[in-house]
């Protein structure tokens, strides 16, 4: 007998009007194309103040969290998301909240995370209890997804202003900038939790930050939310301009502290929010601009949503005008369905929420009849034969329908979910699949009776017969290659020769190398491995030769072996299995003896 579960109530956002109505308010898409919208990138909670970080082949996105039904900036915690393809985002929950800082009382507002010294530092503005004014704290973690802890037990900066951003220059000097109505900076020490000297106010001149009219006390366009970075020798300060409502402007300089020159508008006044907040990165050969608006049901100035656009710098380094869209950034590569995928990795979700899972990480919960998850660009290759899911239910469960192209598209499988005796009492269920081939948008549609049906932790497809689901590592894996055991010699006078391993018929792989970043004395490369054969790969191995004296210092999404200038990168535990026609990537950092990276011709072989 299952105990009667307590009622589970969805938040106000998910009980709101259909998302399409709200999206069309900021879009010129026709109804036929609007169904493919991927902005805002999070739909089950309100998010604001995006701060992206590129680390080990993924984008980690740190956001604020607007509470449902807010009539002010009611924010109690911060959230983390990550993606390798810019469209399917994994929810990592809330590793930092006001309660992390014993000295803070309210207002978990816009912050930023930077990586240094093997750690991750999160700079955030909060209200200090002792002064009842805004101060900037710093939290630290060993992982980009936390958990974070208060690094110093007190404010780092406490002059009543907000919106910290941190930039580390090429010489290793780190700068903390912040401010509204002023713009300040300090030089951080190498420990990233203290600074030298005193805070310096950056002159807000009209030449540096544009001209505002009608407000004698604030003659420039600068409002708040600075985002400072360097690209190709140019220092950029992108900021929220001239409230209210705000647009995004930017200035450039030849040094990290100015003098700044105003360059114009990045994003015009758009969307249903009177604020905006920028975040800019380069990732996987492209440039991306993050922002927020009020596009979700019930959205507005106090209930915002983070979105992203891909853009290209002008040839002279200036930033083009970027408009809000509902289509968002294009997908990078495809998602591998044959490795375990978290249920909370989502391109678009309807009706669902997430919560911490007893097995670690997060799970999708509060699932009701008709809710669904969209996972974009799933590379099925020649076809999946079965599907497994990790589920839990304190009621009688329901069904996971596997559909292609839309929530009502072709059904390729249907998995029954039983009652398991509790919302965190997990069980793995499996079902056959037929017709899932090529690259498809996968819709996991949930059906059943009334009320909450079940929770959903992870899923995995199998190709060519039923296999045991394999574990997926955390978003920043550090795979350790299994050493090859030393064989024991056979004590016979004439040992039997060991046969040369042969590759099964139909197995083949191809690889391309792309240089995605360069600097004096080094470069970053990306290896794209594709199953070019007719049957699934169980693993792959890439080899290439560097010029004499050059070495690879780091690899992610793979395991590294070096012998002299001969480099071998093998698959990690989670990305070796590739269906025909599907791809995966591995990245590496290498030294370079010249200003231009060497020409590398890698080869790939099945493992």
PLM regions and their residue ranges:
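Secretory targeting and sorting signals
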Residues: 2-36
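Extracellular low-complexity, O-glycosylation-prone Ser/Thr/Pro/Gly-rich "stalks"
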Residues: 80, 320-325, 329-341, 346-348, ...
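Secreted/extracellular small peptides and ectodomain modules produced from precursors
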Residues: 14-17, 413, 507, 602
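C-terminal region of N-terminal signal peptides and the immediate post-cleavage residues
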Residues: 26-38, 462-468, 501
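Extreme N-terminus of proteins, especially the signal/transit-peptide cleavage junction
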Residues: 8-11, 34-38, 43-44, 502-508
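Short, basic/low-complexity N-terminal boundary segments at the transition from targeting/disordered tails
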Residues: 19, 140-142, 602
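Carbohydrate-active catalytic/glycan-binding domains of CAZyme proteins
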Residues: 36-413, 421-465
């Amino acid at each position: 007998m299952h105990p009667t579960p307590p009622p589970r109530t969805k938040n106000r956002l998910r009980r709101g009007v259909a998302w399409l109505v709200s999206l069309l308010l900021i879009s010129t898409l026709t109804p036929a194309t609007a169904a493919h919208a991927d902005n805002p990138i999070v739909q089950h909670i309100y998010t604001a103040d995006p701060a992206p970080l590129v680390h080990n082949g993924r984008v980690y996105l740190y956001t604020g969290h607007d509470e449902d039904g807010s009539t002010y900036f009611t924010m109690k915690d911060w959230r983390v998301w990550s993606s390798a393809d810019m469209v399917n985002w994994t929810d990592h929950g809330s590793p930092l909240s006001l309660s992390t800082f014993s000295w803070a009382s309210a207002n978990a507002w816009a912050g930023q995370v930077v990586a240094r010294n093997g750690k991750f530092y999160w700079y955030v503005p909060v209200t200090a209890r002792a002064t009842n004014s805004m101060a900037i704290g710093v939290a630290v973690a060993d992982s980009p997804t936390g958990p974070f802890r208060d690094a110093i037990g007190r404010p780092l900066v406490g002059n009543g202003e907000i919106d910290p951003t941190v930039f580390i220059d090429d010489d290793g000097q780190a700068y903390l900038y912040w401010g509204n109505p002023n713009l300040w900076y300090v030089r951080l020490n190498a420990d990233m939790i203290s600074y030298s000297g005193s805070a310096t106010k950056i002159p807000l001149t009209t030449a540096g930050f544009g001209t505002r009219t009608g407000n004698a006390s604030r003659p420039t366009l600068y409002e708040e939310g600075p985002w400072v970075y360097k690209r190709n020798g140019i220092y950029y300060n992108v900021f929220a301009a001239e409230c209210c409502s705000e647009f995004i402007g930017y200035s450039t300089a030849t040094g990290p502290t100015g003098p700044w020159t105003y360059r114009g508008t990045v994003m015009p006044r758009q969307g249903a929010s009177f604020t905006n907040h920028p975040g800019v990165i380069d990732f996987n050969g492209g440039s991306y601009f993050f922002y927020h608006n009020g596009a979700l049901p019930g959205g507005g100035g106090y209930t915002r949503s983070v979105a992203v656009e891909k853009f290209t710098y002008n040839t002279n380094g200036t930033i083009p005008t970027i408009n809000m869209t509902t289509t968002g950034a294009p997908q990078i590569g495809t998602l591998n369905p044959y490795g375990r995928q978290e249920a909370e990795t989502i391109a678009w979700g309807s009706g669902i929420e997430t919560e911490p899972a007893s097995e670690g990480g997060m799970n999708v919960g509060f699932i009701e009849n008709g809710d669904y998850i969209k996972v974009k660009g799933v590379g099925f290759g020649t076809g999946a034969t079965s599907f497994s899911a990790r589920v839990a239910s304190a009621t009688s469960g329901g069904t996971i329908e596997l559909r292609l192209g839309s929530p009502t598209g072709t059904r390729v499988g249907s998995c029954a979910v039983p009652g398991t005796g509790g919302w965190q009492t997990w069980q793995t269920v499996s079902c056959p699949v037929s017709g899932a081939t090529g690259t498809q948008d996968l819709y996991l549609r949930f059906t059943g009776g009334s009320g909450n049906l079940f929770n959903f932790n992870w899923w995995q497809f199998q190709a060519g017969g039923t296999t045991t689901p394999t574990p997926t590592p955390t978003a920043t894996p550090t795979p350790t290659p299994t050493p090859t055991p030393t064989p024991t010699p056979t004590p016979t006078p004439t040992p039997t020769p060991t046969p040369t391993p042969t590759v099964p018929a139909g197995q083949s792989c191809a690889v391309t190398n792309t240089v995605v970043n360069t600097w004096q004395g080094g470069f970053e490369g990306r290896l794209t491995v594709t199953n070019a054969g007719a049957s699934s790969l169980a693993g792959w191995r890439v080899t290439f030769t560097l010029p004499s004296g050059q070495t690879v210092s780091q690899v992610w999404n793979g395991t590294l072996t070096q012998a002299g200038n001969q480099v071998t990168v093998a698959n990690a535990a989670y990305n070796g299995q590739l269906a025909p026609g599907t791809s995966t990537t591995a990245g590496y950092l290498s030294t370079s003896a010249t200003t231009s990276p060497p020409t590398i011709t890698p080869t790939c072989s099945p493992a």
